[in-house]
Amino acid sequence: MAAVGPRTGPGTGAEALALAAELQGEATCSICLELFREPVSVECGHSFCRACIGRCWERPGAGSVGAATRAPPFPLPCPQCREPARPSQLRPNRQLAAVATLLRRFSLPAAAPGEHGSQAAAARAAAARCGQHGEPFKLYCQDDGRAICVVCDRAREHREHAVLPLDEAVQEAKELLESRLRVLKKELEDCEVFRSTEKKESKELLKQMAAEQEKVGAEFQALRAFLVEQEGRLLGRLEELSREVAQKQNENLAQLGVEITQLSKLSSQIQETAQKPDLDFLQEFKSTLSRCSNVPGPKPTTVSSEMKNKVWNVSLKTFVLKGMLKKFKEDLRGELEKEEKVELTLDPDTANPRLILSLDLKGVRLGERAQDLPNHPCRFDTNTRVLASCGFSSGRHHWEVEVGSKDGWAFGVARESVRRKGLTPFTPEEGVWALQLNGGQYWAVTSPERSPLSCGHLSRVRVALDLEVGAVSFYAVEDMRHLYTFRVNFQERVFPLFSVCSTGTYLRIWP
């Protein structure tokens, strides 16, 4: 019977090799990456070769015992964790030295090809070391934005730089990326909500446009039917007059034909009587003359006396119709083309220093404190107001303003000469015609007292400026409900005006 001895085999050898490799890693200096030689421990607990840490701390002769006595009194950073450590408190680690000595007596077998990784792993390992000093990257220079080794850290190049342990730098970078990721996710959610809202609003607008197309088609169809009807009536009247003229003409011609026949016959009889001998002539003379006296004179009704009057009346209607249609076409074209919407932006040179304008110069809100801005002659230095970049002196224009739900805003138009310096009232006398939200109430800023407006919550308001008739009107965009109209005799160019006097609200030119 064979004796049973300790189990050996490939598995047992591999495990022993792995344990030996792990033990060798624990007995390896993190600076020189070799087995410890005269290991010493610092106050944080990490251990290094005495010569290695001496080089890191730039202590000439640190490898000798006498050099330790000349250690500086101030703490220096641990090469591995950056915790402060006093060089005078270095302690020899005899147990670690004994382990390193034992490991030197054994040599681990060379790894078989492919057994401990690939060329890619070797390349990664090489990339994890400093190309200048051959030391592993354990630190991160925040000023240069790159990984460095403990020897680089003590070099003059990095002496004044902010340096972190590599794991802390990685953690900080991950936290920063996570915070950015949270912001991006929030922006993504906002974009998704905006896209959904945009789709919904676009769908509603398309539906509304389809309804408007049907209305326009129906209105023009009704207009065409009306014009065809009136055309038929007028042409029918002209045809009726033509028949009357023709009938009257036929009647007159028939009557004239009878009378002409009678007169021709009588004329022939007179001529025959005149050719007879004297005695016969005298005997028939009286009867012939009597027949001439009994013949009625021609009294036909002329065409022009009655018909010309009727035709003139129809011609007058045609003339009036032509003028009315011309005016109708001009008015219709003018109504369809008037009040073209204008694209506005805010003028930064007019903005009060406390007002903060959006990057696209469409929105404005009130900041906590005044900004350091140039003292431009057009700038409002006291009133928190800003004008649009373009003004108007003629025509019809409109724009829309998105308004905040809280108190502290006003907008409308102001004349170009409105005072920019000092505190000035918000009144028509000062050249300002505006709508306002104050004290939870919407107001038309009239004079001497403001006019309260009876309207529900406003989110967007249309301003319609008609310089031809002298009017500034405000409408709730949701249902185009009329809010108020100022009647103004404009004498100069006017500019859209915006004012925000509370940090809790805003105004924005829409869209």
From Swiss-Prot:
GO terms for molecular function: ubiquitin protein ligase activity; zinc ion binding. SUPFAM superfamilies: B-box zinc-binding domain, Concanavalin A-like lectins/glucanases, RING/U-box. Changing residue 499 to A: Complete loss of interaction with GYG1. Changing residue 426 to A: Complete loss of substrate binding. Gene3D superfamilies: 2.60.120.920, Classic Zinc Finger (3.30.160.60), Zinc/RING finger domain, C3HC4 (zinc finger) (3.30.40.10). Keywords: Antiviral defense, Coiled coil, Cytoplasm, Golgi apparatus, Metal-binding, Nucleus, Phosphoprotein, Transferase, Ubl conjugation, Ubl conjugation pathway, Zinc, Zinc-finger. It comes from Homo sapiens. Skeletal muscle and placenta, at lower levels in heart, brain and pancreas. Isoform 1 is widely expressed with high level in testis, kidney and heart. A zinc finger (RING-type) spans 29-82. GO terms for cellular component: cytoplasm; Golgi apparatus; nucleus. Its main location: nucleus. The lineage of its organism: Eukaryota, Metazoa, Chordata, Craniata, Vertebrata. The keyword Metal-binding applies. This is E3 ubiquitin-protein ligase TRIM7. Changing residue 423 to A: Complete loss of interaction with GYG1. The B30.2 domain mediates interaction with GYG1. A zinc finger (B box-type) spans 125-166.
